[in-house]
From Swiss-Prot:
The keyword Cytoplasm applies. Residues 281-310 are annotated as: Disordered. Methylated by PrmC. Methylation increases the termination efficiency of RF1. This is Peptide chain release factor 1. It is found in: Cytoplasm. It comes from Stenotrophomonas maltophilia (strain K279a). One of its GO terms (cellular component) is cytoplasm.
Amino acid sequence: MTPTLRRKLEALAERREELERLLAEPDVVADNTRFRDLSREFAQLEPIAIALADESRAKADLAAAEGMRADPDLRELADEEIAAAQARLLELEQELALLLVPRDPRDEGNLFLEVRAGTGGDEAAIFAGDLFRMYARYAERQGWKVEIESDNPGEHGGYKEVVARVVGRGAFSRLKFESGTHRVQRVPATESQGRIHTSAATVAIIPEADEVDDIVINPADLKVDTFRSSGAGGQHVNKTESAIRITHVPTGVVVECQTERSQHANRDKAMKRLKAQLLDAERQRQDAAQAESRRLQVGSGDRSQRIRTYNFPQGRITDHRVEGLTLYDLPNILAGDLDPLLQRLSHEHQVDALAQLSAG
């Protein structure tokens, strides 16, 4: 472990001890907000304290085993214990390094999933539908809930656009690297010559932020349109203009909601999503400025970036952000078995974040 990382660990250990003292003070206990915030910070630092204590014990075990080597009768046993202690220390060093990677406070929250057909006409819409089903199936495996907020079906299947809210613990942490352009290579069902066509769809993963209630939007900046819903709710929704489309004029961000029976409920949902989008756009701008010099763009969330290719003739899926990340398991991945991809992307992101910490 580099001296820089070791210093960071020591500083966090000191902060944890300080928090322990603060949480025992009567005035802190009496202040519910401060007590909650400090308790949350303490809980985040506790795994580091536990790992450091384990490391101290492993170092003591190593020293004791090395002392045993002076006795010829115990040398073989000592060598075994030395090897075990060294392996444990290496394991703990890696664990501590990963614990240093700053946690994204949005990781445990819900998200908005937006899938839009790109270039490729009908085939792009069909592919957008494939992607949406892939994420919906993955969400089902995790026990998450998927609520469609608005959709625009393609003429021959799939979606020109579909927006859904994904509700479940850790949803954003799992799917946050999916934003970007996804490309498909396959022979369309309507292709009589057997030629491979290339089309694309874009995916946006937007965290549902707790802070949206604090965002103030000038009503003069909004253009609100109502229209007849084509979504859930049966015949009733088609009889009244209950669906809402809100345009944030300064940024051009447009959101729709048509899933509720009442215009008021649709407006509330649309405003919540608009605020989440504006907050996410500002965070992306800040992240892009900070990440300008970074090698790896796994966590950039840039929706214009081509991140992945799905090649049907070869049954291959390639993620272009990570060298060598190609899997020949396309049917299972489209069926919702995304973990082999998502875990590798998460690991690469952690490695990159550690490199930034070491350089800092």
